[in-house]
Amino acid sequence: MDPIDVTYHDEVGFLDDKNRNWQDWIMKLLLLAKKEIGKDNNLEMSINFVDEDRSHEINLKYRDKDRPTDVISFAIEDGEDAIDLSVFEDDPDFQEDIGDLFMCPSVIKRHSKEYGTGFDREFGYTVVHGFLHLNGYDHIKPDEAKEMFGIQGKVLEECGLPLYPDQLDEGRGK
């Protein structure tokens, strides 16, 4: 499978944890999700770890939500303005930039306690959820939600972080 080139920006020191290689685990999640949605080209994206103030600021400015959130995604292709990438199909060095994620570890930790999922499960859910948004998936309509949360569930299960029966509707907590 072709790789995903991830650029990290860590404003909160999340990746400094010497007891865990977060980047390897994130890559495992991303590659499983990429395989699950049938993407076979080279991808690039960024993941930005931010504090609650920054998450709140971004969420208010771009989503009109007056609170911090776990993840905000900014997809390069959003809506009907899709870019025709077929001109690059014969270029093995071309990387499709899918966008940027802004993740807030402290909100993810709080959600893991609220939903009773544990940090690893909630973090994995959030990474995959954001990645799917960058690739055009959404959960506004029930049929879209079923597809998106189904993909999340399969990826998490492959990582040993299965969804519980009462979480299948949203792919998340209780």
UniProtKB/Swiss-Prot annotation:
EC number annotated for this UniProt entry: 3.1.-.-
Principal cellular location given in the protein's record: cytoplasm
Pfam families found in the cross-reference section: YbeY
Example of a GO cellular component annotation carried by this entry: cytoplasm
Cofactor(s) listed in the protein's UniProt record: Zn(2+)
UniProt keywords, alphabetically: Cytoplasm, Endonuclease, Hydrolase, Metal-binding, Nuclease, Ribosome biogenesis, rRNA processing, Zinc
Annotated GO biological process: rRNA processing
Family classification: Belongs to the endoribonuclease YbeY family.
Protein name: Endoribonuclease YbeY
